[in-house]
Amino acid sequence: MGFRGKGSGMVANRAYKFRIYPNDEQKILFAKTFGCVRMVYNHWLDRKIRQYEENKTNVTYTICAKEMATMKKTEEYRFLKEVDSIALQQSLRHLDTAFQNFFKQPKTGFPRFKSKKRNKSSYSTLCINGNITLSNGYLRLPKIGQVRLKQHRSVPSEYRLKSVTVSQTPSGKYHASILFEYEEQVQERKLQKFLGLDFSMHELYRDSNGKEPAYPGYYRNAEKKLARE
């Protein structure tokens, strides 16, 4: 769970993971989306590696996104339009983060290409203008539609849905990790009482109520004795 400041409270994030049950048509769309985000990641990872090896520079996310928009208009890659466009953009953002980390620590090597066998099938998408909803046991996703969901925990009504990561296990089970944002109120304590302390040479201190500490007078007695000597 993460926090950040906003107004008088703290904005916190909380994720819920639910099992989802897509129908056969939705399973096909999920498989297409998993494949497309993996292809996008690998295509521009190769592009970034080649440019880095040529002149030690990086291909920015903005450039990659523009190139992808152009690619989607071609006959060869028009299938990219069949899946959630935000999921493809998120794949490029994840790649950009991975490559930025490589720039900070080049000795770690380039990010690895994603493999269907080695990597878990998943994709992430963002909630924009209410395009994702969770209601009455169904999760509505862009390009996918209403997916049946087993909601074993209730979500407070004031929580705001931010993003969803859909994943498939090797055994074929589907899950949705849903990230919510909410404002956590900070309890302000009212000042009940104020006490001032006045330090002096005659006593250790005197508070604003006129009280003095009842410490033994060893120091003062020794001071008087030294003065007599």
For every predicted segment, state its role.
Residues M1-E229:
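Nucleic-acid substrate recognition interfaces
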